[in-house]
Structures are given as structure tokens and as C-alpha cells.
């Protein structure tokens, strides 16, 4: 016997087609004018539901499809690349329509959410057959069951397992002073339950948003439309959702928070500024709205300490490729290079720690203690990693259960995670570092009975959906066991009945099947159908449905059997649903210790991963100091080093010492010169990345490192046009430089690469000169300043804490060889022409460039511009011919000879072949001279 589980093919969709089109038998042309202004019942329902969900694309269930109409259809069609068609008319106009199959709806939802759209999922709340009982024109009951937005998704199929999915609200309140405002950010990951708030201001807002990296931003209409902020919001790549002013209602904020968490007052969470309360309340209000009243297991909001993490602006994060590369990919970033985590939660926590390195030296040292302990304890580290790899994603499973979207597999994940956590908690002795000991305590705090109860209740193989049943272990509930036995016995009776019908009718292909519309039925091929319609079988079998190639019948005996099976099956499923609800309630009751256990598992994963990284890549523990030290011995770029290792090449390690000289209290600045491709940018970036790694709690790629805590990290490395804001490359460069010079403090670290290159030589040199002096005299910070303006090296005579450094190169047979070694001193040349030659510029261009360079270098310092105009015909307004420098009008006659000579390999030629080649070359030269 086989079950036919397919749904009736778009039965409801066909009914809707009838609603939208003229009934059969009536002239459609004549009826069109009459019905031009009539709204069909189905479309009236659609319009009503759509009006209640503005700003969202409405997925409207029609049988086996979700369909979209009107403007939603046009948007979805373009976004998803699916066909836009039309279905009937509304108020005399064609209705645009597109649809996606129910079976692929999650895939299309993922695409729409990734593009920043919000989707309201409207489902059928009853079977179409129930609607027909109320009358032929009755519409199936429907309503929105999910509001899916970029910041509130919890389904694994829509989430990146290794990336947080943050919903963030920005609140603004008036501050003292004319036109002054206080800002606050509240942000939560609904899929894990984390919830934090932080104070901000207009200057810090962009940096805070870059650090948190939200999936969706909530702001009030007034703030979104503020003239000063309008371009800012619209320039963000993150979806921004404007909300009515009431969502940011200050007087109701505290009450809303207290009601959400079920406490008398929000004061129990700590002291919050007014803007912080408003932002937090806006977040929970939006969650309640999008989750249709369901409440995820959020942690109470925690206030971030001011200055608790290294400030890294958005541009610096992009330049350093901390979490993603400039093209938006994870691969090739610092995170990808150091990630040795074995759990999704650990990967998310590692990304967060890289995004917000600590500034509290005690907390940094505590993380280093934990990593160092695990570096030494090899067996313990590897045993922990093995257990952690078996731990599911507790936090996301808990969130789905608390929202009523949990599955049997989510309950299984809770059971498995808690069991692994309890086992891990007993693995540590009394001499465990502080951070690890805290994790062990949190894991041990979960009562063992919950994991035991879940394990006893759940089967080994769990279905994806609770509605499928079959997830309760045999023997757990006696009532369920007896009901299942009745159901399963009935199924064996159906199989026996099928065999009897085959024997009685002689139709070997006869099958008893089942679907949701007909229930159980007998199916035979069209060729055998007449046999059942004739005596004596027509007294037993009643025709029900004719299909293409098959005919379906039923019988009284089969109907009675179906009633018994349905009753037992429905009761068994109902019992399982009751057990599921009871287990889910127990999990929700223990949500706080479960959430804390999930955080502990993630932290242990990060610590063991960083220890494994240190062992594998030879990283060392940095010495953290209270001062402004920055002394790195044998530093390496973590990403470039691994890339070179994959190709079998070594990475050249370099020292960097920006610590204050003995006679000064402020840090050094290194002025780095050297040719392009020599490794200046790599050197600058690697030192910034070492600071980030150290303060994130990791060991660093170096032989030794002594570092004072960096409060702010600034980088201006590379630039591009900002066409959306009408900014040229040079303007972007100047804006970034201005931010650095205005904000860098004595404890900051600044890396600057080629300031002033986007304008004329003298303008650029002047700006670079003045910027370098400002860093030295005003900011007095640690800095690496790379430049091609060699004239700046003379500033070391006036600036006590400025030191010259250069990237070592050598020449071999006219070519430049990059040694990638940073040494004291200044470069005397940029080797730009040699680099151009390596890049493959035509030989004639290289030769011309050398000639021009010779003239430039020989130019007199007095009035050089006129000298160049006179002696370089290519640039002169009225050229005075100079035979050796005349601008070429075509290929040089000798160029074929040079190319032929370049192709020859003397070591591969026999004496006779070499002599022939020599004669051939002389002949080519003679022909060239004749031309």
C-alpha cells in the first residue's frame, strides 16, 4: 500500500480563478463593463489584509502557491526574476500577479529578505472544503501568520549560521544646548536573545552602526526625514525601517519594557538614560508586532560601558577587512584567517569580539590568561573541541521554541546541548583561569533533569515538523503507545484489505491509496475501471474520481476502516502535540540558564579556537601595558602569511617600535618610504591587525609584542570615488584624513598611506607635510605614515619622535627585487618605472618614461616648469624638436629585433643555431636601417 500525500492541485487557486473571472456560460465581453467596478470576495479579502500590513510584500496563500498582486507582484517579479503575469481584473484594470510554489517559498523568502524587503506571510486557516460548506462563493479564511523582516528572522533556512542577525533601533532626544541631541542605540539578535543598549552621539553614530553591523535599523519618521540625516539614512546599505512617532514614545517606554519582561519596573535592569529606554522599548514593540504577540526569550537589556571597546570607524573596518573583504566576502578577511571555531555560536562570538576589541586592560589580560592556559593544556583543549563540535546551536533553538516556531529537532538540540554542557562543566580543576571558570559555572547551573526528560521523551530520529508526529520515544507515554498500536494495526488491516480486493477482482495493479480530499480510495488503471463498474463488483465499489490514466473508487468497508484509522491517528498526533507543548513550556521556563549555557559554550569555543590558532600559526601572547607602548618583534600579517603559505612561499616578518623614546612621554611616528609593491601597505595593516587581535583577546602573529591599549584605531589606506555624494577620490581622502586629525588621541593608533596623492604634487606634498606635523605636535599618537614624498624625510631633523623607515629593495640586471624587509632609513627612489615594467607596459612606453625621468631629475631647481616645457616636446605647447626625445609616431624600427632577442634562450642554443640567430638578427637590423 502507498500513501498519496500530494495536495489537490491548486484547488483553492482554481476557485479563486473563478472568483476573478466571469462565471461559465456568460458572455465575458458583455459582462466586463458591468463588473468593472465590482470587487470579488477573494480580492476584497486580499485588499483588507494588505491594508493591515503596509510596507510589506504580501505572500497570499492560494492552494499550493503563495501569490502576490498589484505593486507587490511587480516588485517581487523583478527581485526574484520570476514571470509577471495577470489574473483577472480589479475595478476594471488588469491585476498584475506572480507566484512562488509553496515548496520553494523559504528559498524565495531568503532572496527577498537579503534584498532588504519585509514579507507578510498570509496562510489559509481552513481547508477549501470547509469554505465550500458555507456556500459556493465563500472565501477560504486567511490571515497573516508571520511577518518576516531582515532583523527579526529566526529560521535556520533564512539565517547565516556564523553571523549575528541584529535588529537595531536609534532613538534621539533633545539635549541641553540649542540644536543638541542625545542618541541611543538598542540592539538585539532575536534568533539568540542577546539585548544591549549603548549611548551615542551624532559624531559616533556611523562608527557605532559599523561596529554593530545590524541587519535592520529602526528609526522614527521624524528622525528619518530630518534634513541633516536624510542622506545618511539613505546612503546606508542596511535596510532602514521608519516607524510612526508613537513607536518611540518616551512616556510609555519604561512601561512597555517592564510589561515585555514581566517586571514591575525597568529599574531592575539598571540605570538607563531616557534615550536608551526609548530605543529599547522601540525594539520590543517592533518584535511584538512582527512576531504577532509572541515573545522571544530575550535577555534583559544590558548597558554597554562608555569607551568599553576600541573605536574603529566604518572606513577603517573596510580598509582592514576585519570581518569581510572590501567585496563583501568572508573569505580573505581577518576573521576567516583566524577562525578555528567548531560551533556556529562560537563563530558569531568571535566575529563580535573582532568587531569590538576591549579597552579594559584587566579584561584583555583575563582573555589572554584563558587562551594561554588552553595553549599549554593540549589534551584538555582537544577534548573540549571534540565535545563542543557535538553541541548544537542552543541559542537559536531556544528562540524558535519561545516564539512557538520550534520543531522536535529544536527540542533535541536543547537536550544535546545541555548534555554536552554538563559534561564540559566537570572537565576543569581548581586552577582554571577566571573566564573559563565562569563558563563552567554557567554550564553546571542548568538542572540535569531537563536534559534527562527531553532525552527520555524524544525519539532518536526526529522529524523536521511537529505536525508530522513520530517524535515521541516508544515507551515514554503508555496512552500514546496504545493509541499508536491501534493506528498501526489498522494500517496492517488496510494492507490485508488491498490484497483481498486484488484477489477478488483479479486486478493485480489495484492499490489502496490516501489523500486529504478523498481519504482512502481504491485506484485502478483506466483499462481496468470498467470491470469494477460491472456486476458483481459494482455492488461493492462506488466511483469517486476519474484521473488521467486512473480511476478511483471507494467502498463501505473502506470507509468504515478509514474512520477507525483516522480516529486513532488523530488521537496519537494530538497526544504528541500535548507532549511537545509540555516539553517546550519546560524549556521556556528554563530559558535564562539555557541562554547562559549557550553563551558559555560559545565562549569556550572561541577560547579553544584561539588557543589552537596560536599553536598552529606560532602566535605569541602580547604583553599589555598601561602606557602607549607599541613594540612588535617579527610581526606578520595574519591573512597574507596564510595566503603565501598555501602557495609555498615564506612571509618576511618585520619589527615595529612606536613606543616613546627614552627622552619623551609620547609615542613615535614612523615615516615609511619605499617603492610600490615593496610591502608598505601590508606592513601598515599588519600592525593595526595585531593591535585588534591583542585587544580582542587573541595571541598575535609575532615573535614578541609589548602593547599599550589603543582607544581608537584609524586607517586611511586607499580611496575611491563616492559618486552618490558627489565626492571625488581626493575629497574622500581629505574627509577621512580630517576625521583622523580631529579625533585621534594620545592613546590612538593611526595608519596613513600616501596622503595627498590625489592632487598636484606640490599641493599633495604640502598637505602630507602639514598632516604629519599635526600628528606629531597635536595628536601626539602612535602612527605609521607611508609616503612617496621623500622630501618629508627631512622632518626627522625637527620632529623628535619622528623616525624614518624604508622597505628594502635591490636591483639585479636592471630589474628591481623586492625584499619586503623594513629597515631604518629613507628611500632615495620610488622605482615606479621598474614596477610599470613588471606590470607589462609596452617597451616603448618604458623607454619613453626613462627618458622623461632623466630630464626631470636633471631639471634645474630654478624655474623648472619652463625648462620642462622647452626640453620635453611631448608636454610643450610649441615643441622645439629634440631628436633623442621626440614623441614617437609609431613602432621603433628596431623593436622587432629587440623582441626576437628577448625570445632567445642562449643556454638552449647549439653553436650552429646561435650563429644562425646572430646572422638573422644582423639582417633584421640592416633592413630596419634601410627603412
Swiss-Prot record:
GO terms for cellular component: cytosol. The keyword Glycoprotein does not apply. Pfam families: MutS_I, MutS_II, MutS_III, MutS_IV, MutS_V. Gene3D superfamilies: 1.10.1420.10, 6.10.140.430, DNA repair protein MutS, domain I, MutS, connector domain, P-loop containing nucleotide triphosphate hydrolases. Residues 1-10 have a biased composition (Low complexity). Signal peptide: none annotated. GO terms for molecular function: ATP binding; ATP-dependent DNA damage sensor activity; damaged DNA binding; mismatched DNA binding. Keywords: ATP-binding, DNA damage, DNA repair, DNA-binding, Nucleotide-binding. One of its GO terms (biological process) is mismatch repair. PROSITE patterns: DNA_MISMATCH_REPAIR_2. ATP binds at residues 674-681. This protein is involved in the repair of mismatches in DNA. It is possible that it carries out the mismatch recognition step. This protein has a weak ATPase activity. Belongs to the DNA mismatch repair MutS family. This is DNA mismatch repair protein MutS. It comes from Azorhizobium caulinodans (strain ATCC 43989 / DSM 5975 / JCM 20966 / LMG 6465 / NBRC 14845 / NCIMB 13405 / ORS 571). The gene is mutS.
Amino acid at each position: 500500500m502507498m500513501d498519496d500525500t500530494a495536495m489537490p492541485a491548486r484547488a483553492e487557486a482554481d476557485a479563486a480563478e473563478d472568483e476573478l473571472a466571469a462565471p461559465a456560460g456568460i458572455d465575458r465581453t458583455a459582462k466586463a463593463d458591468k463588473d468593472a467596478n465590482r470587487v470579488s470576495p477573494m480580492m476584497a479579502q486580499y485588499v483588507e489584509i494588505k491594508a493591515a500590513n503596509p510596507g510589506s510584500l504580501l505572500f497570499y496563500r492560494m492552494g499550493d502557491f503563495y501569490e502576490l498582486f498589484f505593486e507587490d507582484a511587480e516588485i517581487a517579479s523583478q527581485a526574484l526574476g520570476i514571470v509577471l503575469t495577470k489574473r483577472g481584473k480589479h475595478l476594471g484594470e488588469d491585476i498584475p500577479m506572480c507566484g512562488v510554489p509553496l515548496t520553494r517559498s523559504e528559498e524565495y523568502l531568503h532572496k527577498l529578505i537579503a534584498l532588504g524587503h519585509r514579507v507578510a506571510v498570509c496562510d489559509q486557516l481552513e481547508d477549501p472544503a470547509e469554505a465550500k460548506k458555507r456556500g459556493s462563493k465563500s472565501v477560504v479564511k486567511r490571515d497573516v501568520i508571520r511577518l518576516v523582516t531582515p532583523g527579526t528572522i529566526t529560521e535556520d533556512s533564512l539565517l547565516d549560521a556564523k553571523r549575528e542577525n541584529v535588529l537595531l533601533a536609534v532613538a534621539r532626544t533633545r539635549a541641553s544646548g540649542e540644536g543638541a541631541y542625545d542618541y541611543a542605540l538598542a540592539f538585539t539578535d532575536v534568533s539568540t536573545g542577546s539585548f544591549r543598549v549603548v549611548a551615542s552621539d551624532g559624531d559616533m553614530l556611523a562608527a557605532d552602526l559599523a561596529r554593530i553591523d545590524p541587519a535592520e535599523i529602526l528609526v522614527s519618521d521624524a528622525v528619518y526625514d530630518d534634513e541633516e540625516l536624510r542622506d545618511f539614512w539613505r546612503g546606508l546599505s542596511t535596510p532602514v525601517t521608519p516607524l510612526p512617532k508613537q513607536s518611540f514614545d518616551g512616556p510609555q517606554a519604561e512601561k512597555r519594557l517592564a510589561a515585555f519582561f514581566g517586571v514591575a519596573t525597568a529599574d531592575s535592569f539598571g540605570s538607563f538614560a531616557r534615550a536608551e529606554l526609548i530605543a529599547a522599548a522601540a525594539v520590543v514593540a517592533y518584535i511584538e508586532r512582527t512576531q504577532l504577540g509572541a515573545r522571544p526569550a530575550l535577555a534583559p537589556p544590558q548597558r554597554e560601558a562608555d569607551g568599553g571597546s576600541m573605536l574603529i570607524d566604518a572606513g577603517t573596518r573596510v580598509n582592514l577587512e576585519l570581518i569581510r573583504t572590501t567585496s563583501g566576502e568572508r573569505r580573505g578577511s581577518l576573521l576567516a584567517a583566524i577562525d578555528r571555531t567548531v560551533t556556529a555560536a562560537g563563530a558569531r562570538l568571535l566575529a563580535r569580539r573582532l568587531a569590538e576589541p576591549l579597552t579594559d586592560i584587566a579584561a584583555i589580560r583575563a582573555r589572554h590568561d584563558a587562551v594561554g592556559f588552553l595553549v599549554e593544556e593540549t589534551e584538555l583543549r582537544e577534548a573540549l573541541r571534540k565535545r563542543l563540535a557535538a553541541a548544537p546551536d542552543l541559542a537559536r533553538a531556544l528562540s524558535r521554541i519561545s516564539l512557538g516556531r520550534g520543531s522536535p529537532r529544536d527540542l533535541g538540540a536543547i537536550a544535546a546541548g545541555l548534555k554536552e554542557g554538563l559534561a564540559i562543566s566537570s572537565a576543569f580543576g581548581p586552577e582554571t583561569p577566571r573566564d573559563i571558570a565562569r563558563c563552567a559555572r554557567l554550564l553546571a547551573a542548568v538542572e540535569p533533569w531537563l536534559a534527562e526528560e527531553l532525552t527520555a521523551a524524544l525519539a532518536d530520529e526526529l522529524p523536521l515538523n511537529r505536525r508530522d508526529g513520530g517524535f515521541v520515544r516508544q515507551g515514554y507515554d503508555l496512552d500514546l503507545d496504545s493509541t499508536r498500536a491501534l493506528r498501526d494495526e489498522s494500517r496492517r488491516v488496510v494492507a490485508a484489505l488491498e490484497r483481498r480486493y486484488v484477489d477478488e477482482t483479479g486486478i493485480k495493479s489495484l492499490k489502496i491509496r490516501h489523500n486529504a480530499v478523498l481519504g482512502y480510495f481504491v485506484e485502478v488503471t483506466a483499462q481496468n475501471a470498467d470491470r469494477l463498474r460491472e456486476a458483481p463488483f459494482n455492488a461493492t465499489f462506488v466511483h469517486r474520481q476519474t484521473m488521467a490514466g486512473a480511476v478511483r473508487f471507494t467502498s463501505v468497508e473502506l470507509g468504515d476502516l478509514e474512520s477507525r484509522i483516522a480516529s486513532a491517528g488523530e488521537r496519537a498526533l494530538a497526544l504528541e502535540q500535548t507532549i511537545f507543548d509540555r516539553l517546550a513550556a519546560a524549556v521556556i521556563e528554563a530559558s535564562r540558564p539555557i541562554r547562559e549555557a549557550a553563551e558559555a559554550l560559545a565562549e569556550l569555543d572561541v577560547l579553544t579556537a584561539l588557543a589552537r590558532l596560536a599553536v598552529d600559526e606560532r602566535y605569541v601572547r602580547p604583553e599589555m601595558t598601561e602606557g602607549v607602548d607599541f613594540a612588535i618583534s617579527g610581526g606578520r600579517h595574519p591573512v597574507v602569511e596564510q595566503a603565501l603559505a598555501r602557495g609555498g612561499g615564506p612571509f618576511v616578518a618585520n619589527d615595529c617600535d612606536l613606543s616613546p623614546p627614552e627622552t619623551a612621554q609620547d609615542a613615535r611616528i614612523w615615516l615609511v618610504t619605499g617603492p610600490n609593491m615593496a610591502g608598505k601597505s601590508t606592513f601598515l595593516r599588519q600592525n593595526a591587525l595585531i593591535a585588534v587581535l591583542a585587544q580582542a583577546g587573541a595571541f598575535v602573529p609575532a615573535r614578541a609584542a609589548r602593547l599599550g591599549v589603543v582607544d581608537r584605531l584609524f586607517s586611511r589606506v586607499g580611496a575611491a570615488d563616492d559618486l552618490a555624494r558627489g565626492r571625488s577620490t581626493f575629497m574622500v581622502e581629505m574627509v577621512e584624513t580630517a576625521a583622523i586629525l580631529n579625533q585621534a588621541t594620545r592613546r590612538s593608533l593611526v595608519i596613513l598611506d600616501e596622503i595627498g596623492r590625489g592632487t598636484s604634487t606640490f599641493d599633495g606634498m604640502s598637505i602630507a607635510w602639514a598632516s604629519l606635523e599635526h600628528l606629531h605636535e597635536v595628536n601626539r599618537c602612535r602612527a605609521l605614515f607611508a609616503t612617496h614624498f621623500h622630501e618629508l624625510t627631512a622632518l626627522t631633523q625637527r620632529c623628535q619622535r619622528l623616525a624614518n623607515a624604508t622597505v628594502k629593495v635591490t636591483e639585479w640586471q636592471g630589474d628591481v627585487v623586492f625584499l619586503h624587509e623594513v629597515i631604518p632609513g629613507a628611500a632615495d627612489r620610488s622605482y615606479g618605472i621598474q614596477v610599470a615594467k613588471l606590470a607589462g607596459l609596452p617597451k616603448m612606453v618604458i623607454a619613453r618614461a626613462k627618458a622623461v625621468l632623466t630630464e626631470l631629475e636633471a631639471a634645474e631647481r630654478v624655474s623648472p616648469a619652463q625648462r620642462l616645457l622647452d626640453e620635453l616636446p611631448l608636454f610643450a605647447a610649441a615643441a622645439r624638436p629634440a631628436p633623442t626625445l621626440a614623441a614617437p609616431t609609431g613602432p621603433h624600427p628596431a623593436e622587432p629585433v629587440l623582441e626576437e632577442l628577448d625570445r632567445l634562450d642562449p643556454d638552449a642554443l647549439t653553436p650552429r643555431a646561435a650563429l644562425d640567430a646572430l646572422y638573422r638578427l644582423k639582417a633584421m637590423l640592416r633592413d630596419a636601417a634601410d627603412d
